[in-house]
Structure formats: structure tokens, C-alpha cells
Amino acid sequence: MTQLDTTTLPDLSAIAGLRARLKQWVRTTPVFDKTDFEPVPGTAVNFKLELLQASGTFKARGAFSNLLALDDDQRAAGVTCVSAGNHAVGVAYAAMRLGIPAKVVMIKTASPARVALCRQYGAEVVLAENGQTAFDTVHRIESEEGRFFVHPFNGYRTVLGTATLGHEWLEQAGALDAVIVPIGGGGLMAGVSTAVKLLAPQCQVIGVEPEGADAMHRSFETGGPVKMGSMQSIADSLMAPHTEQYSYELCRRNVDRLVKVSDDELRAAMRLLFDQLKLATEPACATATAALVGGLKAELAGKRVGVLLCGTNTDAATFARHLGLG
């Protein structure tokens, strides 16, 4: 089985080096400054539009980071991964671009749009009953078929990939007083927060989780990785069944605070992003916005705040249903 690297930490040289290598494979996604975002007048909001990334989310960065590091034998054997949807899409996309066979394990409740994207990109899809069963299945595939396991939110290569997002964002945006970033298993936040603190130690890093899937909150409270039981949230792509040591440690080191948002706040933020920015987002993508206009509104008033829009792998019917239109 793949041994996750728990000793190496991303530094600016490694992050910049990977950014250069990824240029032909992933997009440099734009930022958009909005000084008249209606619910937070006087706050300058810098939106990072990672929802325009190849494969629809930030996950492509970690996927390419892992796959580009494989040797010829590993490429020939193929890759596997486990995901509620977006990581599987990212791995399937990267594997297609690099000519590597992919078998992805997804939870059976995954969005049909995400399952269809994986198949469109040429991956074999295996559906599992729940998150823990999915992890058990992917480790069996890894062991029996010799495929390389691309972890969805842990390990040096995955986190180095997401660190390129933070590096790119601050280069584009310039000085920010704070950044707000969604958290599921912690891989996105581990990378982004590492890059932000290396480049701008004074910038406040705030993580956001759904109330019904707060694995990192629980990890911070207990002082280490946790396993989750039953979870409930419309932000299905943030419902990690557990946290892992590597990504937890980086979040613990670099994240200044965590907040939670409710499903109703997510729905309101989705509508807000559609009404004011004309963006159709999945619930996970709206978490940072929900926090900005909710619990963080007074604290961040008058400041320049970065808001990460991390992905939008949804479909029209699901989007309409969340907004009460379907």
C-alpha cells in the first residue's frame, strides 16, 4: 500500500516549482474584486474563481500533482481513488489527460452529474454504500490490482497541489486581511493555508465547515484525527468520513479559526452568488460566502477579504432544488 509522506512539508520553492509544472495541465483561475457585495457593504471581497478549474473544482491540482510523480510502472498499473464525487472527477480527468488507466470508487449517493463526468473522462466507476465502505473498497483495489491510491485530502503530493492554489491566489490578489476557505477532509485547507502563511503570515486564515459535517472542528477539539459517524449536509462533497494526521497537522498549524454554517445559510449563499455574480455553484462552493455574510460579517467589516469558490460540479435540477425552485 502507498505510504503517505508525513515528514515533508511544502515550502515556497516546491510550491512554485509545481505551479510551473502544472501550467500545461491546469488553469490559472481568475480572481474577481467586488467592493459592492450587497450583504457586506464596505468590505472589499476578492473572489477566487476556482470553480472554473479544469474538471470543475480545485481537485485537479492534487490529482495532477500525484499522477505526474508516478514512474512508468505505476502509470501502467493505473490509479484508484475514493470520493464523494469531485476528487474522482479530478483524478479521472488527470488520468485521461496523461493516458493512465483509472478506477474510481464513489459513494452511491454521489451526484449523477459527477458520476457521468468520471465515465466521460474514461474512468471505471465503482459505487460503494457509504464513505467507510468506499475507503475499504479502494484499499482492496489498491492491494489486489497494484493501482496507485490518490488520496483525496492527505499526503504531501495532494497538499502540494492545493498549495499551488494559495500561491497563485495571493500572487493575483495582493494583500488580503483574511481568506475564507471551505473544509471537508482538510486537503484543500492544508495546502492553501500553508501557502498563505508562507507568503503573508499576517493574513488571517479562516476555515468553514457545514454544521452537519464538522470533522476538522472535532479534530481541533480532540487534538488529532477523528472518525465521523452519521453526517447530514447538502454540502455532500465536504462530508469526509474522517480526518488524517498530515492534513490535520497543517491545518492546526496554519488555520487561525474555524466556523460552521447551516444548510439554510448555504442555500442563501448559493442564491446570493447567482443573483450578484451569476454563478451556479454547488453547496460546498458557497460555504465561504455563507460565512462571510453570516457569522463573520461584523468581524471582517471594512477589510479586504478573499473568498474561495472551490467548485461547481452540479446539475440544473439539483441546483434548482437547493434554491427551492424545483
Swiss-Prot record:
InterPro entries on file: Ser/Thr_Dehydratase, TrpB-like_PALP, TrpB-like_PALP_sf
Q: What is a GO molecular function of this protein?
A: L-serine ammonia-lyase activity
Could you tell me what reaction this enzyme catalyses? L-threo-3-phenylserine = 3-phenylpyruvate + NH4(+)
CDD domains in UniProt: Thr-dehyd
Q: Which Pfam families match?
A: PALP (PF00291)
Query: Can you tell which superkingdom this protein's organism belongs to?
Result: Bacteria
Q: Name one GO biological process term.
A: threonine catabolic process
What keywords does the record list, in alphabetical order? Lyase, Pyridoxal phosphate
Q: Which cofactor does it need?
A: pyridoxal 5'-phosphate
Q: In what way does activity depend on pH?
A: Optimum pH is 7.5.
Q: What induces it?
A: By L-threo-3-phenylserine.
In this entry, which stretches build a coiled coil? none
Any idea of its EC number? Answer: 4.2.1.-
Q: How is its activity regulated?
A: Inhibited by phenylhydrazine, hydroxylamine, p-chloromercuribenzoate, and HgCl(2).
Its quaternary structure? Monomer.
Q: What is this protein called?
A: Phenylserine dehydratase
What does the organism's lineage look like at the top? Bacteria, Pseudomonadati, Pseudomonadota, Betaproteobacteria, Burkholderiales
